[in-house]
């Protein structure tokens, strides 16, 4: 009888420890799965923004516009 009580106590103690650790690591995993993609997006957005700024500078560069205009005018048929 004493042995059964000891096994029961050990089982419940093990169950509580495993259950608590599962909840703890589950919470850590949830937080990690939310934070890691957010951090990755943050760095990728900075790169995208810098590329977009560079493209806008190239778009509004006067020399670049004149080169584009010349290319388009050369494509037009002459009548």
From Swiss-Prot:
Protein name listed in UniProt: Antimicrobial peptide ToAP2
Prosegment location in residue numbers: 50-79
Keyword Signal annotated: yes
Signal peptide range: 1-23
Organism: Tityus obscurus
GO biological process, one term: defense response to bacterium
GO cellular component: extracellular region; membrane; other organism cell membrane
Family per similarity comment: Belongs to the non-disulfide-bridged peptide (NDBP) superfamily. Medium-length antimicrobial peptide (group 3) family.
Highest taxon of source: Eukaryota
Keyword Manganese: no
Subcellular location: Secreted; Target cell membrane
Principal subcellular localisation of the protein: secreted
Swiss-Prot/TrEMBL keywords: Antibiotic, Antimicrobial, Chemotaxis, Cleavage on pair of basic residues, Fungicide, Immunity, Innate immunity, Membrane, Secreted, Signal, Target cell membrane, Target membrane
Biological role stated in the UniProt entry: Antimicrobial peptide. Shows antibacterial activity against all M.massiliense bacterial strains tested. Has antifungal activity against Candida spp. and two Cryptococcus neoformans strains with MICs values ranging from 6.25 to 200 uM. Also shows an inhibitory activity on C.albicans biofilms at high concentrations. Exhibits chemotactic activity for monocytes, neutrophils, and eosinophils. Shows low cytotoxic activity and has weak hemolytic activity on human erythrocytes. In vivo, treatment of infected mice with M.massiliense reduces the bacterial load in the liver, lung, and spleen.
Tissue specificity note: Expressed by the venom gland.
